[in-house]
């Protein structure tokens, strides 16, 4: 199978604290990988480097055989830690913002809302959602672009 993500000696320091130290991983298409470790082990930090949310102190992140760049976000879906929601917008409106930015057809919004069982939330604002509903909306956002690489950090947090 084709390699979709590869890291070489990935490191991340915050001041004098080493959060990630020499992580090398190869992720193949159509595979499921998990990062295991105690709190503070650097799992979320590593995932943030995979998506460009953090820059490595040293090392490289390769996506589809080339060094990661912003254009790759069109093919990556992610939910890391807290869902990135506009609390004053409905589920549909939250997805419409992203669909417009990524040139995704509006019918995809209905598809992902059905996948996460949020198709009947109407005009209710995301800020009024339960924690589980917010998490499901975050998963819908991650799935919206039908990503080649899907990164989920504790995706079952708060699910009802």
What are these regions (language model features)?
Residues 59-74:
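Conserved ABC transporter NBD signature motif
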Residues 139:
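Hydrophobic anchor residue at the start of the ABC signature
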């Amino acid at each position: 199978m084709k390699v979709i993500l590869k890291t070489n000696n990935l490191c991340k320091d915050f001041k004098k604290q080493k959060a990630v130290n020499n992580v090398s991983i190869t992720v193949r298409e159509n595979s499921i990988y998990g990062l295991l470790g105690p709190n503070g082990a650097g799992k979320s930090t590593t995932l943030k480097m995979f998506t460009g949310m953090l820059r490595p102190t040293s090392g490289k992140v390769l996506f589809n055989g080339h060094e990661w760049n912003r254009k790759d976000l069109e093919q990556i879906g992610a939910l890391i830690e807290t869902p990135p929601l506009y609390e004053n917008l409905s589920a549909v409106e939250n997805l419409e913002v992203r669909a417009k930015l990524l040139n995704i057809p509006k019918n995809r919004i209905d598809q992902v809302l059905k996948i996460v069982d949020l198709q009947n939330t109407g005009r209710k604002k995301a800020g009024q959602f339960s924690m589980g509903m917010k998490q499901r909306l975050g998963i819908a956002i991650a799935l919206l672009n039908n990503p080649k690489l899907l990164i989920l950090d504790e995706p079952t947090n708060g699910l009802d």
